Structure formats: C-alpha cells, structure tokens
Amino acid sequence: MSRIGKLPIKLPPGIKVSIEGNNVTLEGKKGKLFHRLPEFLKVHQQDGSLILENTADSRQSKAMYGLHRSLLNNAVMGVHEGFQKKLEINGIGFRAAVEGKKLVMNLGFSHPVVYEIPEGISVKVQDNTKLTIEGIDKCLVGAVAADIRGFYVPEPYKGKGIRYAGEVIRRKAGKTAQK
C-alpha cells in the first residue's frame, strides 16, 4: 500500500466537493476543478476530509494510488489558494509585456517572441523583467512557466535568459587570452 495514498486529504472550509462515481469536482473561492479517478480507486468524504481506497492489488494500482491522492490534494489546494511561479528575465534590452491574452517578450532575437496565455492562467509583469504566473491547476502553471523559460534558457557565461526566481545559474569562466 502507498503511504501517501493512505493519508486523508483535509478539506479547508469553503470547498464544495461532489463525487459522482469516479469523477470528483472541487469548487472553491479561486475556481472549479475536475479530476477523474481510475476504476480501481474509490473516494468518499468523511469528517471534513477526502479518503481514497484502492480496490485492486496490482503493482500499477499501488503506484497510481499515491499519485492520484497527490493530484487530488493539489486540486484542493488550487481551488482554495491557487498556485504561482515567478520568473526573472536577465539581459540587456530583454523585457516582457502582456497584451490581452498574449505575452510579448523581447529577448534579443530579430523578432519579438509572442506566447499565447492558456485559459485559466494569468500572467503579471512587474518592472518589465519579473513575471508572475498564477492559476488553480498546479500542472498547468508549471507547464506554462517551463514553456516561457524554454524561449531563452539561461546561459552559463553571462547569465542571460529567463530563469525561475531564486534559481542559481552556475557560471563558467570565458576564454582566456593566449600568449
């Protein structure tokens, strides 16, 4: 049995849960999320918490037990508090701006890089170089942050590029002049 899967998921006040077979719908102050469980997992609500039960005994079901418990917990946290990732843009002339549902970035290329912001995600720009990505779906927030970072991964010589806030880039020494 999974140690993580056995743990109950505490429901904060104000979260509405509806369970229909293997479909779980969570609704909170930030929004609404839907999660579908595999056939071998059952969920029920008890004493202000959600409890998952594994009805199968296969190796795969044991692995999926902990995974789906974590995914449900992330959904509960998402509709209650939401998730955010912060990115920083380093480089001379590098900047970003939000125009409607598009993020426009000047990253030293001959053209601006335009990224279509997905539904359910909000991007805020401070000081033209600091991005904050917010949403209720943890997986989608992380994927959007990784997509944006992928446009110009920080390089080790000058440190130019898009990086996560607090990320440390290992710097390399450049070429030394030969005599």
Swiss-Prot record:
GO molecular function: rRNA binding; structural constituent of ribosome
InterPro entries the UniProt entry points to: Ribosomal_uL6-like (IPR000702), Ribosomal_uL6-like_a/b-dom_sf (IPR036789), Ribosomal_uL6_a/b-dom (IPR020040), Ribosomal_uL6_bac-type (IPR019906), Ribosomal_uL6_CS (IPR002358)
Keyword rRNA-binding appears in the UniProt entry: yes
Top-level taxon of the source organism: Bacteria
Name this protein carries in UniProt: Large ribosomal subunit protein uL6
Keywords per UniProt: Ribonucleoprotein, Ribosomal protein, RNA-binding, rRNA-binding
One GO CC term, this protein: cytosolic large ribosomal subunit
Name of the gene encoding the protein in the UniProt record: rplF
Signal peptide: none
Function: This protein binds to the 23S rRNA, and is important in its secondary structure. It is located near the subunit interface in the base of the L7/L12 stalk, and near the tRNA binding site of the peptidyltransferase center.
GO biological process: cytoplasmic translation
Record note on quaternary structure: Part of the 50S ribosomal subunit.
Family: Belongs to the universal ribosomal protein uL6 family.
